[in-house]
Amino acid sequence: MMLKPQYAILRFAKYKGPEIGHIEAHNERTKEKYASNPDVDTSRSHLNFHLVQPERKYRAEAERQIAEAKCRIRKDSVRVVETLVTASPEFFKGKKKAEIREFFEEAVRFIEKHQSKDSIISAVVHMDEKTPHMHLSFVPLTADGRLSAKDIVGNKKKLTWWQDEFWKHMVKKWPDLERGESASETGRTHIPPRLFKEATHLNRQRDMLLQLLGEVNPLNAKKKSTEIE
């Protein structure tokens, strides 16, 4: 039986204003329920752990760093970049929590090689969803003190560079890992994780509704499906 490939996965998302509070609520698990994300099993949230503990609210910490750097800023400037780090589900199968922690600690070390350690607001690993993953949030300050997400995560070429370097770094410890494919290479449009999960949830609800319609009147199920679409 051919084994499924195990990919090292690194993704970036940029945030400018009020949405920073939304990602903080998700990452830090400050809500009691997550209706828009059915993958969250709150009974397992105690298994989540921080590799970088936030000292204050994400937005407040971002504004503090920006003010301290005395850099120019616009109202629509990206203040926080969120890095999503994970691997294929097969990679984590059979691994103990200490081994999983080691994987994400190594990922943090990789980020710190290319971005100031002091700019990192939080790095939290979620163990309460289907696949372990880390949300690492940082303020996109350049080495010369500018606020520029474009310079750091940049264009398609820069994103490909990040993917290459991440895989080169991680494969030294985990030789079975393969390089993940970036959206620029596959041609797929990137969808933020939160929106992707919401869409998945809506599709599940639709499938359940169609099933119920079929049970009530199998002859009309196909017609109802067309109406729903």
Describe the residue ranges of each PLM region.
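N-terminal nicking endonuclease/strand-transfer module with a His-rich metal-binding environment
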Residues: 1-229
